[in-house]
């Protein structure tokens, strides 16, 4: 609260007048202090509600006004009950493009008016995990937004540790392209391409041509592999994958292993990226990997899977799991700005924020709507 000594005379006089005569002064405080937000109200039920507008809680916080957000497959997993850390009542969302409205006293890299990408990972930059290059496991952050704290599917969002959790946009790149750099492309790149050790002249198979699988596709090409094989049930998605640079596409079915072996002359695949998150696709990856190869899992698994060590124990394979750290975001911004990658092509549907419940309905039945990634505009 302001003290009277700091208020200009007009405000002091108004204050005295109001106190003396008990005047009722109209206010818009409620409309200014509340906002619309998409809430995990119950299992299977996204609900648009009115919530209090967030405020600065710590000097390292920023408050941002959302410009665009999107829906992640992980949000759907939350509604299925697969994410135990996310409680009902949570405002969802961990991706977005926004404008900084307010910063805490300790925020030094950003100021009100800056247009930013909101990272899906909150990083304090100082804990042992952050210093070891694993901000996804930050002891005061990590995957917090839309999980353990309120997220970006709201008109305003509080961003903890703003200096380590926001990135300035590239002015010459589209907002839709940079929205995909909040999570989708960094996840495909870091968890798939980097963990999978994609390299010059190698062979790559990506099981699942959804947004994250396509993120792995466009970034794997930075390393000039010999073959990139996309595998999916959806032929339209495979058609887009071919347009984005896949050398081969395979419609998943009873003969998928034989088809991939034919493409690779019977050797199998050096890097298999699992980008779906169900037992059947994890088993398929184990059948496709070559001797000495890597299975890089980036799918979110909500059920137990089988690891067939009776078949793999002597194949010298590597199996990796990872939560995205989003350390690659500054580099990916440069690639988008230069036109080297074009993730805006993932955006197939646009909605106004007031229609976000409909956006969830469409994204939840993505194949029926030929939907890859929805963009929600404020």
Regions found by a protein language model. Name each.
Residues 1-34:
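N-terminal mitochondrial targeting presequence
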Residues 33, 235, 283-287, 326-378:
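C-terminal hydrophobic helical "lid"/dimerization subdomain
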Residues 52-69, 82-131, 170-173:
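Glycine-rich beta-strand-centered segment in the early N-terminal region that forms part
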Residues 124-207:
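NAD(P)H dinucleotide-binding glycine-rich loop of Rossmann-like/cofactor-binding domains
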Residues 171-254, 258-259:
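Mid-domain Rossmann-like dinucleotide-binding core that forms the NAD(H)/NADP(H) cofactor-binding site
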Residues 293-294:
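Glycine-centered, small-residue-biased loops immediately flanking beta-strands
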Residues 299-316, 331-334:
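Rossmann-fold NAD(P)-binding glycine/threonine-rich loop
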